[in-house]
């Protein structure tokens, strides 16, 4: 099964999407889903003494402006594993530039976790948590000599727009 092409983007898009975990929370290993091999591969180990602040992965059947599937971060208390599918509620969007390309990231919470039942928008997340996530993406590639830039957070409505946009880009490229 191709976890990118064979799974719907979610059960109730854009309000609820599937996140296919590539990198568990707390990991320094950067795994990527290799679309052609249909397997997870170790892309690299982070050069810095930092770790992923949330579950990190992709939304199936999406394509974003950087030519890759739409990235998604899912806030969790405990890490899962590569390949885990999390039914997720988008709550925000981190605007970001990576290597000159727009590389925004959806921030979401797991539908099945009662700790996040009342979280509907990034305004429901402590400001410091958002700063930690943005700081990770501002610094995690510095020792590789690569530049990333975060441009700020937007709320759930912008996240929904980004999800719909990425589904449309995928549809135009692969389904027409």
UniProtKB/Swiss-Prot annotation:
It is an enzyme of class 3 (hydrolase). Belongs to the PPase family. InterPro entries: Pyrophosphatase (IPR008162), Pyrophosphatase_sf (IPR036649). Mg(2+) 2 binds at residue 71. Mg(2+) 1 binds at residues 66, 71, 103. Its EC number is 3.6.1.1. It catalyses: diphosphate + H2O = 2 phosphate + H(+). The gene is ppa. Catalyzes the hydrolysis of inorganic pyrophosphate (PPi) forming two phosphate ions. Its cofactor is Mg(2+). It comes from Methanothermobacter thermautotrophicus (strain ATCC 29096 / DSM 1053 / JCM 10044 / NBRC 100330 / Delta H) (Methanobacterium thermoautotrophicum). It is found in: Cytoplasm. This is Inorganic pyrophosphatase. One of its GO terms (cellular component) is cytoplasm. It comes from the Archaea. HAMAP family: Inorganic_PPase (MF_00209). Homohexamer. Substrate binds at residues 30, 44, 56, 140. The keyword Nuclease does not apply. GO terms for molecular function: inorganic diphosphate phosphatase activity; magnesium ion binding. The keyword Transferase does not apply. Keywords: Cytoplasm, Hydrolase, Magnesium, Metal-binding. It holds the Pfam family Pyrophosphatase. Gene3D superfamilies: Inorganic pyrophosphatase. GO terms for biological process: phosphate-containing compound metabolic process.
